[in-house]
């Protein structure tokens, strides 16, 4: 153990010496070697003489080069190869070496240095080709031109290629191309990456302008104000509400000297101090105002919970029914009202830098923290398309290290909302929503507490205005909990006299807990076949309600109930004159009908999984849903349909067209999101009640659904069952008479009643004397199954005979007489 400790201590000491002291001096030593070699080469080239002994010349005279025979040989090789460009080798080595010695940065990128050296060598070759273009002067002592062997070879090769392409002035064009390449390469090698034309123009203009006469220096200011004092002075006295001041500077910042008079500033403008790019970026963000929305105050309570505890007021109706108490629901934990403004600003800066990396320019103008997500409002620069930012949702989530990110346009503002989950997620409880003043004092007829907005505000929707709701979401997204919260919202508001339910639950798990409550018109339907019968009964109930409303001349259920209550309060009734027939003289007979209307309750049909029903009886379900969605609003009948498979075979075009209000919980793909909402975004949700609510008109709002446990639902259902026995209607699931059901089936297919269709088929068979299923199918333009049913009925009633071995039937009925 001691040996291992000594070894680790030795290694740590060696690393400290190596990286803390030795490595900077090693970098300086290498730079010094490069500098010395460059100086030696420069001296050898400066004292070059073509007559000195070298590899190309053998003489008995001593070398006149300052470095002797070695210097003469090296300088001869460089001059013969590159000509005057050989001077560039020595100069580049001096630049590299001096820079290395001056900086001595151990973290310097060696790869960058190697790249600069390689590009510099290529630049010297291009420069030699440029120098080979003009003819050498008379004092030039070498056989090759001013560019040496490599310069002449490169220039003649490129000129030959251009001449082969019949381009005039090939040599001049080649020299120009090599000149451009040499300038770019050598500039990169010495560290010139960008050239600012405006800076060059300003420098030339300042050089050409006459200098202003120096004025006497002003007296020094009494005292210089530090940076913090100047910032405080620059800020307005009363900052805008909801905006945080810029971050304060450090205590030990260097004071800034007092400002000079205007004349002195015109005479000389000092250059700005050089500072790190990251610090400059952060300072610019600090100085920019960034509004942070204040967290919402706790939801304003309606006082219902206090009244229930004091027993000073009970929610009794005329029939003695008592609404459930809020104490049956779980109480929420207190939320923190403080917002970490520094963390939000830091996230906003990081988000801006991430967007800049993907080429999106803009500015975070507003930050809206919420219980589950925080929305950063990006004001994009002119020319930035919204679709481009929306497409970066996955990349933004990856760069910000969050689970998911949703990007959408902020309604009514020139901003793009970027929604990212909070590090700590708050839970929304149904009790908080039902105890809020928005729910208690709302004017909605069928209020549903959908959840809280991004800012933490309760969101109460009215099912009567929707008028139907389509819900989709995968398993575990919070869909079933959301449906339970919607049902409980109505049960906490309306007694059975005002609202009744028909619940269809093919999965036999989600809605069975409500079985036996007084609000139900029938037991919870779990058989898909009985679900079809229940929907057909709902259609008949809708038509019956329309007949009642037409008798007293009202347009909707609200007007009908109002008149019914007024008539009952006054002890009056309605009278209507109807024609009952004709007398012997042919005159119509009228009678007075007395109508005593009774208030009709609203009817809510809840289907938990419509996909199972579509698999069993897709056409019947779609036809019934279509009729109810188109006509049931005025009759006070509303649908809530939910599915965990939002595919096009379940949510058909007919269903989507009649359900303008939809809710999408988390789905698995963008295709499912487009199927339910018409646009993507639902695949970026967080699950556990996180939803997108699309109201009529296509406006989409992100909501966080409330949590309600199975125990809470069971407690409320048990309380309601204790209030009384439900009054079930057997015909809801047993169905009406056969003729009515067949008529409804014919109405769903758009062909009128079943009897009319059968009479038409008999007329076709007796007139044309042809009896086959395919023939009836073609003539009546109906499906094969319906045509086969009509043929079996005609065989049963003796219109046609049984089919023989060839499938032909004998027509037993007499032919139809001609008209």
Swiss-Prot record:
Task: Indicate, by first and last residue, each region the UniProt record lists as having compositional bias (Basic and acidic residues).
Answer: 298-309
Quaternary structure and partners: Homohexamer. Forms a ring that surrounds DNA.
Q: Which GO terms describe its cellular component?
A: plasma membrane
Task: Kindly list the places in or outside the cell where this protein is found, as annotated in its UniProt entry.
Answer: Cell inner membrane
Protein name, UniProt field:
DNA translocase FtsK
Q: Which CDD domains match?
A: TrwB_TraG_TraD_VirD4
Disordered as annotated region, ranges? 207-309
The domain comment in this protein's record states: Consists of an N-terminal domain, which is sufficient for the localization to the septal ring and is required for cell division, followed by a linker domain, and a C-terminal domain, which forms the translocation motor involved in chromosome segregation. The C-terminal domain can be further subdivided into alpha, beta and gamma subdomains. The alpha and beta subdomains multimerise to produce a hexameric ring, contain the nucleotide binding motif and form the DNA pump.
Which top-level group of life is the source organism from?
Answer: Bacteria
Supply the SUPFAM superfamilies for this chain. Answer: P-loop containing nucleoside triphosphate hydrolases (SSF52540), Winged helix' DNA-binding domain (SSF46785)
Q: Which GO terms describe its biological process?
A: cell division; chromosome segregation
Gene name for this UniProt entry: ftsK
Composition bias, kind Acidic residues: at what positions?
A: 275-284
Q: Which family does it belong to?
A: Belongs to the FtsK/SpoIIIE/SftA family.
Question: What's the protein's topology in the membrane?
Answer: Multi-pass membrane protein
Low complexity bias spans:
236-247, 257-267
Residue ranges that the Swiss-Prot or TrEMBL entry lists as coiled coil: none
